[in-house]
Every structure is written in structure tokens, then in C-alpha cells.
């Protein structure tokens, strides 16, 4: 499933990998007075005077001596500090686990399991819901697994492609996977992580509105114009930008110039949805510019070169943010444009 989403990990470790650190950690917490027994369970008090709500102790061992999630998560922190000495450890889980991580982080700090300058952060995720507002399920009412979700999205895109007869049957499945990937990843990332959202397959696979396929279509449009220009024997000149001639061109340039700042801000706030909001804005600015501007039929060669350089820059930014793996041969991807009714490419 991760492979289908083109998601890869440098390291894959489970709770069992930290088990060996638990015995020494328990002894350390007891010997240094951080942990004490309360009704038979070994706990560490983590409440603070400034708390506005009750924060229960962090439970290290149950009364029967069994370890808990707190135990393994703390042992994992010790393992990571010993092996990697990270500047920051960031946990991604259901937002309903927030209290658990507050307890773990406070315990780790109190017991000096991490350095003072090591950041511990938690990103809580909301739930992906169906149109009824309840957690997304299969048609049969079971839990929707990622593999099945990917399959349903790909099938939806395949049907749209077949119905429009826009791609050769031999290419239809591959094209459906490309567009389906953009729909899933963009659809999820465009929502603020902590908020619940409705995953509407029909809306997310649409080529209209704030969707991955719409961004992909915009990339297709830029590639088509650039491809047409090169087919005529011309060579694209990088960095040939002139001062903007129209309001739409100026707006597009300003939007492109915000790229670095948006990415930096999204990184600092751990908010990828801000990048999605930006590329949607950029795609809209480009399409506005495109509809107002005769690009390839521009008689002033310097001005035309400027248009094309700007267009290429927009393409690179959109492609980088949507996903580099979506860079496909132009003659194949251009067929996607036909999936949008009334949207035949106007290359002049």
C-alpha cells in the first residue's frame, strides 16, 4: 500500500525493537525516585501547577507487572536518543491520543530521558469520514482499508477514462493510477491534519475545484504548451522573464515568488495543507493568465520567451508539490485533458 502511494521509509521498527530497553528504564525510574507505586502500579506523576484539567500519572507498569503503551513509547524514546540523538521526535497518531503523548513527553522530560534541547511533538489526526459524517466504511459496513480505498479510487478514475474514450485501453489503467494517486494524496493533505473531513470519492476525483486531478490537469496544460513550442524546433530559454504586461501575469509571478516562504512556513508549522492551498491558488492564477494570454501566437519573441519561462516555472512548482513521480511523457498525459468537458487545449 505504501508502495502504491510512493511512500518510503528509511527505517521501519516496531514496539518489540525497544523491549530490551524496558528493564533498565524501569530500574532507572525507580532508583532515581521518579517512579513510585500507587495501588500496585508503577507510575510517574506528571501533573503541573498550570494544568487546567486533570493529567493522570504516566503508568509504567500495571499492578501485575505488565508493560503498557506508555512503557514502550518511553523505551522507544530512550532507544532513539541512544542511537540517533535526534533534534526532534515527532509522533503522528489519532488526535484522541493527545493525553497519552502529553503524559509520555512530560515523563521523558522529568526523568531526563531526553536532552533539554530535544523537541518532542505530537501531530494528531482527525478521522476520514464518509458522506454521512461517520468514519469511512466499505459499502458492506466494514472498516475501509487503505488497499481497498486505493482500488476504489483507481476504479472510479478508470471508469471516467473509459467513458470519455480519451486514452487507449492499454494505457487506461496506468493513467487511472496516476490520476488516482493525485486524488488520494492531495485530497488527504489538503485538509488540516487535526480536522475530521469527508472523503467524497466523486469530488476528490473531479477535474474541477480544489483537487489533485485539477492540479494535475493544470500541469498537463503547461506541458502541452511547452511541448508544442519545442515541436516547432524552438528551445526554451530559462530565466528570460520580463516585467509583467498584464494584471494576470503579475499575479501569477507574485504567486510563484511565494513558493519558498510557503514551504518554509508549512514545515515550521507542520501543516502540509498550507502547501496544497498555495498550489491551488497558483493553479488558478495560471489558468486565469492562460485564458487571457495568447502565448504561442505572441509576435514579440522576447515576450513569448518570457511567457514560456514563467509557464515552465509554474509547471516545476506544481509538479514538485503534487509529486515528482507524476512527470510522465507528454504524449500520454496530455490525453487527461479530454476528461474535462469543454476544456480542449488552446495552444495559441
Task: Annotate each language-model stretch with its function.
Residues 336, 347:
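Cationic, low-complexity basic patches in intrinsically disordered or flexible, solvent-exposed regions
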Residues 340-343:
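Short, low-complexity intrinsically disordered segments enriched in A/P/G/S/L with frequent Arg
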Residues 1-331, 348:
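Non-catalytic interaction-recognition regions
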Amino acid at each position: 500500500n505504501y508502495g502504491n502511494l510512493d511512500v518510503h521509509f528509511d527505517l521501519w521498527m516496531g514496539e518489540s525493537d525497544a523491549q530490551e530497553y524496558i528493564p533498565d528504564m524501569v530500574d532507572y525510574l525507580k532508583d532515581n525516585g521518579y517512579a513510585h507505586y500507587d495501588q500496585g502500579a508503577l507510575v510517574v506523576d506528571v501533573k503541573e501547577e498550570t494544568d487546567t484539567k486533570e493529567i493522570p500519572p504516566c503508568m509504567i507498569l500495571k499492578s501485575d507487572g505488565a508493560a503498557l503503551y506508555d512503557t514502550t513509547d518511553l523505551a522507544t524514546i530512550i532507544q532513539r536518543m541512544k542511537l540517533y540523538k535526534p533534534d526532534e521526535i515527532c509522533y503522528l497518531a489519532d488526535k484522541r491520543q493527545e493525553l497519552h503523548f502529553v503524559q509520555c513527553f512530560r515523563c521523558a522530560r522529568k526523568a531526563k530521558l531526553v536532552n533539554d534541547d530535544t523537541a518532542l511533538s505530537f501531530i494528531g489526526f482527525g478521522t476520514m469520514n464518509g458522506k454521512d459524517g461517520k468514519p469511512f466504511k466499505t459499502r458492506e459496513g466494514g472498516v475501509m482499508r487503505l488497499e481497498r480505498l486505493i482500488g476504489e479510487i483507481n476504479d472510479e478514475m478508470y471508469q471516467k477514462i473509459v467513458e470519455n474514450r480519451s486514452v487507449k485501453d492499454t494505457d487506461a489503467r496506468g493513467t487511472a493510477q496516476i490520476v488516482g494517486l493525485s486524488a488520494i494524496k492531495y485530497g488527504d493533505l489538503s485538509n488540516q491534519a487535526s480536522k475530521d473531513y469527508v472523503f467524497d470519492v466523486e469530488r476528490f476525483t473531479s477535474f474541477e475545484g480544489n483537487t489533485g486531478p485539477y492540479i494535475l490537469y493544470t500541469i498537463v496544460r503547461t506541458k502541452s504548451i511547452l511541448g508544442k513550442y519545442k515541436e516547432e524546433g524552438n528551445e526554451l530559454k530559462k530565466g528570460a522573464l520580463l516585467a509583467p504586461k498584464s494584471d494576470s501575469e503579475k499575479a501569477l509571478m507574485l504567486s510563484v515568488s511565494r513558493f519558498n516562504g510557503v514551504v518554509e512556513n508549512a514545515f515550521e508549522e507542520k501543516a502540509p495543507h498550507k502547501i496544497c492551498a498555495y498550489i491551488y491558488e497558483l493553479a488558478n492564477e495560471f489558468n486565469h493568465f492562460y485564458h487571457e494570454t495568447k502565448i504561442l501566437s505572441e509576435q514579440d519573441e522576447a515576450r513569448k520567451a518570457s511567457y514560456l519561462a514563467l509557464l515552465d516555472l509554474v509547471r516545476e512548482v506544481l509538479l514538485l508539490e503534487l509529486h515528482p513521480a507524476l512527470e510522465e511523457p507528454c504524449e500520454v498525459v496530455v490525453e487527461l485533458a479530454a476528461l474535462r468537458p469543454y476544456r480542449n487545449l488552446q495552444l495559441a
